[in-house]
């Protein structure tokens, strides 16, 4: 057990090119069963930037209380491939984040586009066209366990092509996490460091919450659908009078309630398959491998 939390925050993330991103949404809920709420961007008529998310997290954590914060991106890369970036075999996820930052420091707004273009790191990525012959996209243990559990089919962080690609979001997320840790000593990133008494950042996969509750692969298209999902997560429903929600809104709202719901299961912090490599290098999707 890692103790109790005072708030649950979920971020639907984006690693896209550009200045602002319709794909970013943030939701928050407190303990108990109250409905999650969407957090408006600082310029309410304009979408979030990644830097604004960093600033908001820094501010929100500074308001006090202990938050469990889930971000929908891979926190690391498969080290069967990523280990080749380092001369020493003792490299950790924090070494990887430092490397990504050095390579991408000229990319604005935490973008990670320079990394897969760099000749020393490009070979593991599928970036365009047909899949190169012989290319095996690395996967982390958590992605394999998630598939075996039947709680989703997360893509490899080395895939940078197609609607379901997650690689750009992962690289941007690593830059975000690194920057936040440099600003604050009262946050921890699970499972890489001790979390007791600190606000804790975890990697999330929104579909997992729906799969674990029995909602399955159905889309959440309406407020009525969303409130049905929230009920399965022991959460009150949201006000259904607003315009039709976006996929990003529903992912964030479901995930905030899902974090609160899943956190009641003590086994979520010591899931089956969470080995030494995952704890030191590759990370883990929160909820994967946890007992039902």
Residue ranges and their predicted role:
Residues 2-9, 13-292:
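RNase H-like (RuvC/DEDD) metal-dependent nuclease/polynucleotide-processing core
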């Amino acid at each position: 057990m890692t103790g109790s939390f005072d708030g649950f925050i979920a971020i639907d993330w984006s690693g896209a090119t550009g200045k602002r991103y319709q794909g970013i949404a943030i939701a928050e809920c407190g303990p108990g069963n109250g409905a999650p709420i969407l957090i408006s961007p600082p310029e309410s008529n304009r979408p979030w930037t990644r830097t604004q998310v960093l600033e908001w997290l820094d501010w929100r954590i500074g308001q006090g209380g202990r938050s469990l914060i889930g971000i929908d991106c891979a926190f690391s890369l498969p080290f069967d491939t990523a280990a080749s970036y380092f001369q020493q075999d003792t490299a950790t996820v924090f070494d990887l984040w430092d490397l990504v930052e050095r390579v991408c420091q000229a990319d604005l707004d935490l973008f990670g586009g320079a990394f897969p273009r760099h000749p020393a790191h490009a070979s593991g990525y599928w970036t365009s066209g047909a899949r190169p012959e012989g290319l095996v996209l690395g996967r982390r243990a958590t992605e394999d366990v998630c598939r075996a559990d039947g709680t989703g089919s997360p893509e490899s962080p080395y895939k940078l092509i197609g609607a379901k690609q997650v690689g750009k979001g992962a690289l941007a997320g690593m830059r975000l996490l690194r920057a936040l840790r440099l600003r604050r000593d009262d946050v921890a990133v699970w499972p890489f460091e001790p979390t007791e008494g600190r606000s804790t950042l975890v990697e999330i996969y929104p579909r997992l919450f729906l799969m674990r509750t029995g909602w399955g692969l159905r889309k959440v298209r309406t407020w009525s659908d969303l409130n049905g999902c929230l009920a399965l997560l022991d959460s009150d429903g949201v006000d259904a009078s607003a315009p039709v929600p976006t996929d990003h809104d529903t992912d964030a709202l479901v995930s905030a309630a899902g974090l609160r719901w899943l956190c009641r299961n003590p086994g979520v912090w010591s899931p089956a398959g969470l080995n030494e490599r995952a704890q030191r290098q590759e990370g883990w999707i929160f909820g994967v491998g946890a007992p039902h």
